[in-house]
Structure formats: structure tokens, C-alpha cells
Amino acid sequence: MKESIVLSAWEMVTEFHSLKKLNFIPSFMGMLWLFVIVFYQLTFTYIYIFDKKDEALEALTKFLHTDYFTESIALLATIFILYTLLEPIAKWGMIEMMHSYKQHKWEKNRRSWQGFFDWLRHFLPIFEVHNLTAIFRPLSIITFYILLLRVFGRGFIIPISSVMGIYLIFAFCINMCFSYANFFIIFEHKKAIESLSASTSLALRNIAITGRLYFTMILLYLRTIVIAVIFLVIPFLISSVLAFLPIIGLKLFFLVIFVVIAVILFIFIVHLNSTLEIFVEATWYEAYIACKAEEKTNKNSEKDHDNDHSTHAVHGHDDHAHH
């Protein structure tokens, strides 16, 4: 069953390019926000490890008095707002498009803008679920973990790591249970809390397939992260080479090449991440449909069995009365 779900999901990704068009911009904004968070965390970690607090405070004070401070804050706020809104919009627009493909036997293509506006019918519960589950996302947990280390210091690294490690495992279990929540909102019109409860119930009733799929998705994400890190190291290696060039003209020339390569690699990573997000969403959609269909089949079988048992009981009672 797992293999058929994965194959159907991959077929959907490769056949319908409208899904990639719909998800590219949200994935782009998501990667931008991710890089902002990573840059922030690495910078402050560097400051605390090498005791550069005075230099950092001086640099921050100078930045506050620059002409582009307001523009920088506005840009960060815009990236955050677009990331917060576009990610759930695109995700649930994709679900609507996938369901349309499935209903029409893979023959009816829908344009990206149709999927973009499909989210309107379910925006409030979808957005609520998106925010309720934010505290269980790995990025949020890692960010909070680094914050705790900065606040309490390296002396508390063992207890903090132990507690956050347990919480991370708990978050993985919770995220697995909530994997079907979006589909209950869209297809069964449930509210946010109801969808989370229904998703947990469905996941636990089908724990074997849900667990295997969730573990597979984790491996895919880890592989993507490794590839992204490898590609991100390349521009920094190039910049290190630039530092040894004595001629300013050559430095400018290679700097332009560095920027071009960095942009190309960033777009490639965004495309890779977008495709992975579509595949993951398609996989959970196929799993939801398969689990629902199997439960319906089992329920009908039990009903037929009960009817047959009742029929035999009635005939047996009639025969006994006849004798």
C-alpha cells in the first residue's frame, strides 16, 4: 500500500506542472525567511561563543542610525508576512488541485491561479491549524533551543538538550498525528480543533502506513537539507578564494561570478524544496484517500457480515419454530 501511495504521489508531481507554478513563490518566500532565521542564529551564536558582545553592540548601534534601517525592517516584515500567508494558501490550494485531478481521472488540468483562490473557502480554519501547530515544527524547536542556550549559558547545555530532545521526539509524534488535518478541513468541512482530533484518530487507526510514510518523509527532508548545505557551501568557498586575489579588477570579476552562482544555486534549492513540498502533500493526500477507502471497505464488510449473521439467525429461528 505504501508503494502505491508513493508512486501515485510522484506521478501527480511529474504530470501536473501547475502545482509547481503555484508553490514556487511560497517556497521562495519560505526559503528567504529560513535563511534570515539561520543567519540570525549563526550570528548570535558566533557572538556568544567568541565573546564579541561589545563589537556586536557597536555594530548594532551604527545600524540603527543608518538611512536604510527602516527599509531593512520593512523588508523583513514583508518577507515574514508573505511567508506566513502564502505557505498555507499554496498548500491548501494544492490539495484542491490534487483532488480535482483525482476526481477527473488525471484528465482535467487546472491553472495555478484557480488553486490559489481555492483556499478562500477554508482560510480561517486552515490558518488556525497552521498557527496552532507552529510550536511543533522542527525549525521553531531548534530556534527556541538555541535561544535557551544563549540565555542560560553553556553550563546548562546538558539539561536543556535533554529536555528539548524529548520535546523534539514528542513533536515528531504530534506532527505525524496531525498529518491528515488539512484534508478533514477541506473535504469534511471540520473546524480547526475538530480536524486535529479527527486526524489523530485516523493516524492512530492506520498507524502502520502513517508511521512508515512519516519516516520516509523525514528521510527525504534530511536528504534535501544535506544537498542544500552542500550547494550553499560552494559560494562561501568561492568567496574564500577571492580573499587571496591581489588585483581589485579580478576580485570584482569573480565577485560578479560569485553572485550569479549564488542566485542560480538559491533558485535551484527553492525549486528542489518546492518539488519536495508538493510530493509530501501529494503523498499525504493519497494516504488520506487510501485510509478512508480501506476503512469504508472494512465497514461495509462488517455490515454485510452482520446482515448475513442476522439472516442465518432468523432462518434458524424459523426452522426451530416449524419443528
Region annotations inferred by a language model:
Residues 1-323:
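Hydrophobic alpha-helical membrane segments
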